Amino acid sequence: MLDFLELEETVGRAWHRLIGKTGSWPQYPDHAVQLVDIRQRLAICFRGFGGDIAVQIAPARARTSTHRLGLRQRMALGEEKLAQPLRDEATLMLPPEIALFPDRQLNYDLYVWLVGYMAVMPMDADALPEDALRRDLAALQIAEQTVERACRAFPGLKPRYKRLCAAILAERPKRPLHRLEQQVEARILSLLKQGADLPDDALPTIFPHRGPAGYLPALPVPLWPGLMKREEVAPRTGEDEPVRNSQSEGAETGRQIAQRERQDPRHADRSPFILNRFEKILAMAEMVSVDRPSDDSDEQNAKSADELDDLTLGERKGRPAARFRFDLDLPPEAVDRSLLTAELTYPEWDYRKGAYLPDHCAVLAAPVQEKEKPLELDAAAQSLVRRVRRQFEILRPGREVLRAQLDGTDLDLDAVVRSRCDLAAGGQGSDRVHLMSRPQANDLAVTLLVDVSLSTDAWVDNRRVLDVEKEALLVLANGIAACGDRCSILTFTSRRRSWVRVETVKDFDESFGPTVEHRIAALKPGFYTRMGAAMRHATAKLAEQPNRKKLLLLLTDGKPNDVDHYEGRFALEDSRRAAGEVRAKGVNVFAVTVDREASAYLPALFGRGGYALVANLAKLPVAMPAIYRMLAG
């Protein structure tokens, strides 16, 4: 009753009511559609629309829009952030939530339209002009042409687009603009009316060659995604030092646009006696961490960095106090196309050129160093090993009996009777009257290829990923030994294309025993995951085996990546190509992953039915034998 006497609270509530909700577009939270709920469906739609299979869908980050603000917006923050849909060669960046219309179906239709639009968006378009006016007009021209192309290619989208245009016209804000800005806005409204099949009485406008001073871009239209062209950056030459397990790791955020830091040779040799003017130190609005070799930033910097429109990714020496997780969209690094000279080299697929890069990766093959003590298993794991061995012993081939043989340990009575009858009838008897038994041949050779990259050093549900992988590997290896299948175990990690290390835990002709168990216990985290080269090397060894059936079973915990150009779509396309090469050699390939987000990219790599996702890390030792039994038949 006396709340009005609290002046600060009263003024605060009044101010919040005045400018608390100043967004240009209305929001209807009760009818919102979340990207995370329909991402798989949209990915299928994108493939169906003819989109590239290795292109990923990621949430777009809200970025500052430079359109003209209303009075209340200027009184509030003085800026507006919009999660505008964007596309580059590797990613579709869609708003994490759409609540633009008071109709949930319309919000869902907008997602479907954006995916169809991006599927036919021209990726070879020229960069937009620097001038703001010319950039707006060029973007509108591209949007008009792309809409026409999408509606012509997919007639079923046209009624959807018509409804969306009508809804956008009803929701688009009307605000005072400068004369030239108003003319651009009229052009936007004309295109929307054209899409909604509404009459348009706007007259053609002749725009100047350049926008005048003070011209601000138009408010973006959610129906028309933008194209992000990223130029290649020079490859890095310095040694990479990945950070080992830190104290904390933040939660994942949306796709953050980032660029690599330009290398300044003066930073290589910095003297503490060189004076620096304070004016050179940048504010937090421009960068999170000042380039200093010893001090670490506070964890609050994660939140500050998350609010930036653009991040610059640099390399610093030393161990950070904390780790922050960002989903970065980096410009592609230029590919070093020089040939490598090594004992084992393999090609790599460059999807941009549509050709292989010969002798591009050097594989260093070596045995795993043994550990003095084997892996210690708890009572539950030991019980699982015994149970799996019993289950797999049933799969061990029995002995087959061959009838009507020239020699053997017993007589084939049917053959003897038949031979005597032939002689009694005046015919010629047969000497093939013996039985011979022999063990059935094992017709399967399998290679277990295990990812031991740095990410396996992470902890999930109070257990280290690599420790669980070791346990699962030990359980499965015991089972394979019990059923008698020929098996090899390889691990892989990488650090640039010149250092792809593949280590042998067990070879085909080696029996499973304490030595192999010690090697499994000795596995430790490496660096990065150059999956394509590792798969090609493992397949080359597997293809040499005489068995009729061959299986490459890959165990991994994340996307393929490396410290050089091998990341994003390049890595996905090369890994997908490598999987196709494996199958072309008559080898079945199957991937098992513990990455909970793997459903966004594994179907593109291994196809439908070519992978299994074990979301609960603790269940991996139980799941691996079951998966193997399914694959082994």
From Swiss-Prot:
Region (Disordered): 232-270, 290-314
Keywords of this entry: Virulence
Signal peptide coordinates: none
VWFA domain sequence ranges: 445-633
Descriptive protein name: Protein NorD
Stated role: Part of the operon norEFCBQD encoding nitric oxide reductase. Essential virulence factor, probably involved in the detoxification of nitric oxide (NO) produced in the macrophages during the innate response against infection.
Biased segments, Basic and acidic residues type: 232-243, 258-270, 292-306
InterPro entries per UniProt: NorD/CobT (IPR051928), VWF_A (IPR002035), vWFA_dom_sf (IPR036465)
Classification of source organism: Bacteria, Pseudomonadati, Pseudomonadota, Alphaproteobacteria, Hyphomicrobiales
Pfam family, one: VWA
PANTHER family: NORD PROTEIN (PTHR41248:SF1)
